[in-house]
Amino acid sequence: MKRTLIVPLVTNGNSKVFEYNQFDCIINCVDAVSSLEISKFDEIYFILNKQVAQPWRLEEKISADVTRLNHIHFSFIILPSMTDSPAETIYKALSVIGWDDRCIFIKDGDNKFALDSTPTSGNYIITSSLENLDRVDPKHKSYVKTDEQGFVTNCIEKRVISDKFIAGGYCFRTAHMFKEAYEALKNYNNTFYISDIIYWLILNKDEKFLPVEAKDFLDFNI
C-alpha cells in the first residue's frame, strides 16, 4: 500500500503561504512539512494553481528548498484554475494521483507542527488545544468533539464546540473513501471543507477518526 503526502497550497487566490518566513528563509510550504517524518511516505505532491505557479516560478523555488529534506521523492500537480475549497483541491489532485487504496495524509501549507509519530495508515485528525496558543483567532479554525472512547464524533468549521481545533493535518486510510464522500456532498453543495468530508464518513460509513495531538504548533498566518 502506498503512503502519499499531499500539500495543497493555493485555493481561492490565497498566496500568503508563499511568503518567506522570518526564521530560516525556507518557503513556508516546505517548512510546513519539515517537522513530519517524511521518510515514511512513498511520495509527496505539492498542489499548485497555474495562475500563481507560473508567474512566480514556484515549482523552481519549492524544488530548490525541498531538496534540503533528505532525498524525498516529490512531484507537482498544477491545476488549471482556482478551486472553490480545499476539499475540491484534494479531489482534483487525487483525480491525477489515482483513486486507489493508498493512504493519504493531507498537510496544510500555512502552518507547522511536529508529531510523536506521523500516521501513515488509518483515519486521524491532527489537533491542538486553544490553551497551547499565545495568539489565536478562534473564528477562523475548525473544531472537533470526541466521545468517551476518544473517537471524533463531530468536526465543524468556524464554530467553537470544544478547545480542540484542527491543526491542518488529516490522514485517510484510503484515497477512495475521500472520493466517495466528496461526490456525495457535491450533490448538495458546491463549497465544503475537509472537515465536512470527515463528518460525512463518520455519519454515513461509520468510519472512526482519532485525534492526534500536534506539538509545537505554529500558524504562519498569525
Placement of each model-derived feature along the sequence:
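N-terminal glycine-rich phosphate-binding loop and ensuing alpha1 helix
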Residues: 1-55
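Well-ordered alpha-helical segments embedded in enzymatic catalytic cores
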Residues: 25-32, 89-92, 197
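Residues at the starts of beta-strands that form the adenosine-phosphate
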Residues: 42-44, 102-103, 208
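Conserved beta-strand termini and adjacent loop/short-helix elements that scaffold enzyme active sites
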Residues: 47-49, 77-81, 212-214
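Conserved beta-loop-beta/alpha segment of the NTase-like Rossmann-fold superfamily
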Residues: 53-59, 63-146
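Conserved beta-strand segments of alpha/beta enzyme cores
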Residues: 73-75, 151-154, 208-210
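Conserved core of the sugar-phosphate nucleotidyltransferase
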Residues: 112-188
